[in-house]
Structures are given as structure tokens and as C-alpha cells.
């Protein structure tokens, strides 16, 4: 089974990818991780990627797809894999399709975690953690029992990620949608696009995804 998971930053894509990996035996493939591994291993395509990176240039789609092609030949991918963060453009999607076709493989499902942008901004900007034990909290629905005091360790110091502000999050969402929007009709036309409610609670989203994937066992 070959699956692509689409979702904006903060939609919980990473959490769901881990759950899919565990429950369906799919290997989660991150293009960033694969690039670094290929460069470190000194593979032919890794050397090409290194040349681009050292020159301060973006690695080409051809090289990224080549790295994916090498990676999925490994034994742990024989039962299937989940692509996280790729493709981001129609050109990348087409290159991926061509590569899979050459290997007599096909994409089974593209799962879009659909979100409400304004609600997602609230979800992301409201989160914070204990500076001491890293326990997670939220302004809207997960405040400490005693205001300003961590439930877990009693610390009164909390941290927020610097990029968890409304302007930055909104810009990231806008970038995601501008890149990803053309992918949706592309995959819908191929009959592989499945949409789940990314604003539901974690377990409900997992159940929706499992329902989609159950048709491919």
C-alpha cells in the first residue's frame, strides 16, 4: 500500500503518520530525512544532491524522486510506505507517478487532512509548554488546573515557540494552500483523493484514516 498524507503545518499530520505507520505497517518516508541519509551514505544520487546543497541551490525534483526510488527498494518498504511532505507541486506528483509506474507500483490513496484555517491558527497559536518538564498546554482547552502552575512538576515557567504567532502561522498556511491546491484536482481526477476532517480530535481523525485505508488491505 502506497499512501500520501497531505495537511498543513499544525494539522497533526505527523501524529497521524506515526499512527498509520504502527497500525498498517507502512514505513513513513520524509524527503528531508532521505536526502540527509543519501548524502551521508554517498550514493550516486546523494552525491548529486550534495553538489546542489553545497552550492546553496534547491535540490531538483528529479534528484528527490531518485532518492525516493532508491529508498523504496529497501526491504522495509516492501509492505508499503507513507510519503510525508512530498509531493508539493503537480510537477513533483507527475514525476513521482512516472517513477512508480516504472517500478510497476501505483499510488493507492492521497489523504487530505482538511482544516479550517482560522480554527487551525487558534489551535497553533494557543499552545505552550512547561519550560521544565515540557508538558503541553493550550489557552483554549488545556490550561493548567492552577493558573500559571504546571500540573506535572509545579514549575511556573512556560515557553511558546517563536514561530507560533498569528502572522507566521497564517503565512505558512497561505504558502501550503498555494502549493497544494493544484494537487487536489490532479489526484481527484485519478480517483485516489480521500478527504478527512483534520479539525476533529486525534482519535476521530485516526478512525477516519483507518476507514479509508481499510479498503486497501
For each of these PLM feature ranges, what is it?
Residues 1-217:
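Glycine-rich phosphate-binding loop of ATP-dependent small-molecule kinases
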Amino acid at each position: 500500500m502506497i499512501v500520501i498524507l497531505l495537511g498543513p503545518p499544525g494539522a497533526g499530520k505527523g501524529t497521524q503518520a506515526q499512527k498509520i505507520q504502527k497500525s498498517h505497517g507502512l514505513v513513513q518516508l520524509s524527503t528531508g530525512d532521505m536526502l540527509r541519509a543519501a548524502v551521508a551514505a554517498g550514493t550516486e544520487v546523494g552525491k548529486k544532491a550534495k553538489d546542489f546543497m553545497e552550492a546553496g541551490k534547491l535540490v531538483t525534483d528529479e534528484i528527490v524522486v531518485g532518492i525516493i526510488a532508491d529508498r523504496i527498494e529497501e526491504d522495509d518498504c516492501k509492505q508499503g510506505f507513507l510519503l510525508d511532505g512530498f509531493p508539493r507541486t503537480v510537477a513533483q506528483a507527475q514525476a513521482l507517478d512516472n517513477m512508480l509506474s516504472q517500478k510497476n507500483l501505483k499510488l493507492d490513496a492521497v489523504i487530505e487532512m482538511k482544516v479550517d484555517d482560522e480554527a487551525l491558527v487558534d489551535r497553533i497559536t494557543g499552545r505552550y509548554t512547561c519550560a521544565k518538564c515540557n508538558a503541553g498546554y493550550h489557552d483554549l482547552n488545556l490550561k493548567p488546573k492552577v493558573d500559571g502552575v504546571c500540573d506535572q512538576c509545579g514549575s511556573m515557567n512556560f515557553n511558546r515557540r517563536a514561530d507560533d504567532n498569528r502572522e507566521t502561522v497564517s503565512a505558512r498556511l497561505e504558502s501550503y494552500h498555494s502549493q497544494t491546491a493544484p494537487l487536489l484536482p490532479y489526484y481527484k481526477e485519478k480517483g485516489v483523493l480521500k478527504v478527512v476532517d483534520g479539525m476533529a480530535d486525534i482519535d476521530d481523525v485516526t478512525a477516519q484514516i483507518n476507514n479509508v485505508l481499510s479498503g486497501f488491505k
